[in-house]
Amino acid sequence: CWGALLLVCAALPALAQSNARGDAGLCVGGAPNAPIKIEVFSDFQCPACRTFYLETIRPVLADYASANKVCVVYREFPLRNHQHSRKAARYATAARRVGVWQWVQVTDRLYLDQSRWSQDGTVEATVARALSKEDLKRVEALLGDSAINAEIERDLALGRRQGVRSTPTFFITAQGKTERVTGIVQYSILRRYLDSRLGQ
């Protein structure tokens, strides 16, 4: 595994745990058939999730997913003790249905401005700063679709089945093996791991 550098690392069988892993519609970076797949369960109001996304996942998207070496799947896992995280998850889910780029813009802004909207609940205004007027209208039109909440519930149920108890938790599948990791992993550490699995 990754030794003491990680909070938790449990080897799992390489499962279908992600039929979703092969679903292009859920891949927010990289190709569905990339040699490595990272599935992240995250909460927009979680400070550790903010750090992990901005300092680790964003570089992974830029350096690995853009070259189709890694497929990144993001799962919404809003925690009950976070008052506004469910609303943020709904906006992000709707944005992904509009397009991956819109999802990235919304996710970036929600995490960058987390301290503000977590306090005052201004999720809508935060999302509005991330999107063009046209894209914002498309996202808002989707919010009333029951499928948005249903998708979040599926993510929550999937996470619970896979042993997710806190955020961020992510799963890496490479070379036929899946590992579960809980907590923040620095990009420099994750990069070494990815390179070792890619034979670089």
Predicted regions and their residues:
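Bacterial N-terminal signal peptides
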Residues: 1-13
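Processing junctions and N-termini across compartments
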Residues: 10, 40-43
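C-terminal cap of thioredoxin/glutaredoxin-like
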Residues: 41, 127-200
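A short beta-strand-turn-helix
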Residues: 19-37, 64
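Structural alpha/beta surface segment adjacent to cysteine/selenocysteine redox centers
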Residues: 42-129, 200
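Conserved S/T- and glycine-rich ATP-binding loop of Class I adenylate-forming
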Residues: 38, 46, 170
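Bacterial Sec-dependent signal peptides at the C-terminal "C-region" and cleavage site
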Residues: 11-21
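Loop/turn elements at helix/coil->beta-strand transitions in domains of secreted/extracellular proteins
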Residues: 34-37, 67-71, 99-105, 134-136, ...
